[in-house]
């Protein structure tokens, strides 16, 4: 299965039990910042934004004072799982990032999708990739 298929079929799909509700953007990005696959709507990010995200996974709390930036959009960092999941909020939407052995799985959402639904979609794929040694 191609990485693009994972994005299209497992991240940008309808959310279980909520037909028509889906993430607004998603991607799988290597730890080095190389894009493995992304939705057409995923923002163009700067290398320093990806460096900040990777630093926060290695040093939890790093982004809390400044916020998480992706594609020039600033998200307020909210509770996550140290070294495993970063979550951010901006207005009625937000972002979830799950770290696997080799990649970062990104999901960006807006209402009516809820933070919990975004977390479920992103973390389920991230957990699957971890189980596969990725």
Swiss-Prot record:
GO MF annotations in UniProt: actin monomer binding
Post-translational modifications: Phosphorylated by MAP kinases.
Residue interval(s) of motif Involved in PIP2 interaction: 84-100
Positions bearing Phosphothreonine: 114
Tagged with keyword Disulfide bond: yes
A single Gene Ontology CC term: cell cortex
InterPro entries: PFN (IPR048278), PFN_euk (IPR005455), PFN_sf (IPR036140), Profilin_CS (IPR027310)
Keyword Chloroplast in annotation: no
Keywords: Actin-binding, Allergen, Cytoplasm, Cytoskeleton, Disulfide bond, Phosphoprotein
Entry superkingdom: Eukaryota
Disulfide bonds: 13-118
Database matches in SMART domains: PROF (SM00392)
PROSITE patterns: PROFILIN (PS00414)
Family according to the record: Belongs to the profilin family.
Miscellaneous remark of the record: The variability of the residues taking part of IgE-binding epitopes might be responsible of the difference in cross-reactivity among olive pollen cultivars, and between distantly related pollen species, leading to a variable range of allergy reactions among atopic patients.
Subunit description: Occurs in many kinds of cells as a complex with monomeric actin in a 1:1 ratio.
Summary of the function given for this chain in its UniProt record: Binds to actin and affects the structure of the cytoskeleton. At high concentrations, profilin prevents the polymerization of actin, whereas it enhances it at low concentrations.
This protein's name: Profilin-3
Native organism: Olea europaea (Common olive)
